Amino acid sequence: MLHDDGDASVFVNRDLVEPDTIIDEERIVGRDEQLESVVSFLKPTLQGNRPPNMLLYGPAGTGKSLIIGAVTQQIIELCHSKGERFGVVQVNCQPINTLDQAVYELVQTVASDVGIEPGVPETGVSTKRKYRRLYDLINEHYDSVIFILDEIDLLVGRRANDEPAYSKLLYQLSRASNTNDIEGQVSVAALTNDPKFMENIDGRAESSFNPRDIYFPDYDATQLRQILENRRDAFRQDALTDDVLPLVSAFAAQSHGDARKAIDLFRGAGDLADEQGDQTVREDHVRESQDEIDKDRSLKLIAGLTTQKKISLYATAAVAHCSSATRNSVPSPVGFQVYQWVTEEIDADQMTRETYVKYVKELSTYGLVSTARKSRGRGGGMYMDFTFRGDPESMMHRVVDDTRLERVGTESERLHAVVNAQLREFEE
């Protein structure tokens, strides 16, 4: 039976170690310049004027969502005190595959915020109708609005040679006020890890979006430690052993200064202590939490991939795992040949070599692989070399939840033969 054992928990305010919790300005570390920029850019909203669009870019876990969230929350409260309705429509684009899905997600977000049904089905109607519903909801419930599009660079769309879905979305949203689709003031904030994001959008979208740039660098080790210190009161006063904070900071520093990972690890260690009935959080809880986070993260990322991206990942991992010579790197020509074999085995659509390489390169943004451009020597041309950051066999196992790929998993001997034949041909 369930019972209230809150007094036994190592936490007193667990929300403080939830990465999406909007925290007080006093707890923000190392982001004074970025905070001042966002405040300055959004301040016109309070005077009824249109703020500029913004591009917040920098590595993962560097405070982009934190800063934009903290400032927009303040604006919501200030507008509310004046009887004005400021809407914050925020979506994460990572799990969204198409423009149509993105527009529906925006509709759902607004509807949820104002407590009504979306009023349009997810499928069976045009994207244009979904845009219309989005604009109607905003006009009815908000006086001004900001769209926050997190991880926007991952909203690519399905057609490899078409304008990216994120480019089309930015074009429509950034001009919605000028076209009178939205009656109030509109601002768009795009958040991305990609410093070259603007190079890939259509000229019309670039002109319409025309953002103010705000760069977020990695946190250094001292800043990571201070971020954790500022959330230490999430735990009971004597619940942390002395080695917990330094170890969490060290793990986070290894992840290139990712504060989100540091906070996830901090919280996970506390959760493990609670689950095991311990009154203090120790080093072993931190290490176990780190192992679980690595596994959970890759599982979630892989589960969210499209079937074609799963096939690309599976084929590439198979080269690293099935090679008769121990190797962790995969030449793209070999990976593509194995990809072709896999698609034939499961009767799936077959993408071009360029699309295959593009899909595997995308996996580097998730931290699953790293990429390097290499040469085959004089006259041999260039190719991409993919190196797995985790165990390739584990990646394969995590992909085979796609039922069609399970069939390939049963053909272990044939898969090994195909991989090694292609490697021999490449190396000749």
Swiss-Prot record:
It comes from the Archaea. The keyword Transferase does not apply. ATP binds at T62, G63, K64, S65, L66, Y219, R231. The keyword ATP-binding applies. Gene3D superfamilies: 1.10.8.60, P-loop containing nucleotide triphosphate hydrolases (3.40.50.300), Winged helix-like DNA-binding domain superfamily/Winged helix DNA-binding domain (1.10.10.10). Keywords: ATP-binding, DNA replication, Nucleotide-binding, Plasmid. InterPro entries: AAA+_ATPase (IPR003593), AAA_16 (IPR041664), Cdc6_C (IPR015163), Cdc6_lid (IPR055237), ORC1/CDC6 (IPR050311), Orc1/Cdc6_arc (IPR014277), P-loop_NTPase (IPR027417), WH-like_DNA-bd_sf (IPR036388). GO terms for biological process: DNA replication. SUPFAM superfamilies: P-loop containing nucleoside triphosphate hydrolases (SSF52540), Winged helix' DNA-binding domain (SSF46785). Pfam families: AAA_16, Cdc6_C, Cdc6_lid. One of its GO terms (molecular function) is ATP binding. Disruption phenotype: Not essential for normal growth. Involved in regulation of DNA replication. Belongs to the CDC6/cdc18 family. HAMAP family: ORC1_type_DNA_replic_protein. This is ORC1-type DNA replication protein 5. The lineage of its organism: Archaea, Methanobacteriati, Methanobacteriota, Stenosarchaea group, Halobacteria.
